[in-house]
Amino acid sequence: VNTLASSVRVLLALIVCSSLSGCYVMQAALGQLDVSARREPIAELLSSPSTPDPLRRRLEYVAEAREFATRELSLPDNGSYTTYADVGRPYVVWNVFATPEFSVEPRRWCFPIAGCVVYRGYFNERAATRYALRRRMRGDDATVGGVAAYSTLGHFEDPVLNTMLGWNDAQLAGTLFHELAHQLVYVAGDSEFNEAFATVVEEAGLERWLKFKGLEKDLESWRLQRRRNVEFIQLLLATRERLKALYASGASPAEMRARKHEEFGRLKFEYTQLKARWGGYAGYDAWFNRALGNAHLVSAATYHGCVPGIRAILEQEGGDLPRFYARMKALANESKEARRSRLCT
């Protein structure tokens, strides 16, 4: 692990930060430095007799999935996910999403390297909650969500985190594939394209991984959950489209506020119908058991709005991942508008 190089990058970020109001970059740089400092080589942990057996089994699984990602999925072969870090908390980062009261378009924030993104990430939950409160006081819809993993796009050697190990095997492997995909193709300022590409790689990779492992039961469970998730996302995107039309209708603020409330009530009702069709599956109950606003729809649009278009390109290439990656890299060189018109709903 090149700790010196990582520290130099962080120190440069701190210098940049000294001129920024609120020092948001400071907390991000210090948070990343803390994660980097906690890294331990997985190979050493696996050879150490003091490593607890449950952790050892999870890390053995990660090591095998990581090797598969390079060999079978043509994903980057580097130091990412060859180390482990315990950050001592349930999430590594908390993201704040915000929208104007009468808009489904997310607020965007621009940073070095990542470009403009639809969230602000905080390594401290209270800081994220405070920022979301400030956005609400300015009239925005805002929500905070915990994040168990993220990608530094290859600028650091991303570790496997303790926050990831509570997932089932399929989710853990899928996240590795997703985050490594960000290192392969990433367009600064186009979160929708980036996340949809990584999601398609995650899906394709996980299908192949579970078949490789001979886990037919896990594969069927994952396919069922994916179908449910598609229906859940379609529900959110349909609500988003109705709200988008409402906000463009020219109605008075009072009328829009009332109809907005009705739309989120309709969303919750439609979820109860969907849940009944699922035979009572309650996996999304926690998502709905809160007051909802525009900001809660941001992730659905960001992560899934372009997925069908990108998935179609993978199918056009017969599932050949290197050819698919080449198509994606070519699209990455086009304008954002051209990509969106071709790929996104």
Where is each model-derived feature located?
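Bacterial N-terminal signal peptides that target proteins for export
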Residues: 1-11
